[in-house]
Amino acid sequence: AAATSDIPILGTSITAYGVALDIDDFNGTVGGNISGTSDLADLEAQANMITEWFPEAKKVGLLFCSAEPNSRYQIGEVAKCLSDKGIETKEFAFTDTNDVASVTQSAADYSDVVYVPTDNTAASNTEAIANILVPAGVPAIVTTGKMAAKILTGEADISEMPIEFTEATPKYNASMCETLGIEPLEGYTAIEE
């Protein structure tokens, strides 16, 4: 963004634009030559999912990479939502791939449920995380092209385009539910493998 103010820049899957661009009073529109889509899920809905699926859960581990500001933002918001519901949370932050396993083990030892935000390092280490949480019996809760067309055809001015969010469908991992003995809830769709 600092390299040009003339060429439209559309970001894809940026979780929190205000955080990523260090904008204190972010109102949904970046302005200038930047807009895009966010992969930010409805964090309150995710906190609700934890309490719906696991009503007996008292301690939720928040597993994330401390080097990713967008992950820290999500963790803070989910922690607030869970705290409002009377659920204790504890952060388990790894710094990179090298300490994912040890930090995940600590999270598994502490938690009734582990929450993992949209986090690049966690996503690339899904198997390592699952290999620790599953044996421990701890469950884990884990439109840009159209915008470009509007800019290129003159239908939209990028300086006035708000950040768009993808629509979410509540889903569950059927094989993981079976492995952990969890009965899927109504209103959720199984992830197709």
Stretches with model-predicted labels:
Residues 150-193:
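Hinge/cleft segment of the Venus flytrap/periplasmic-binding protein
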Residues 17-57, 144-154:
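Hydrophobic alpha-helical segments within soluble ligand-binding/sensing domains
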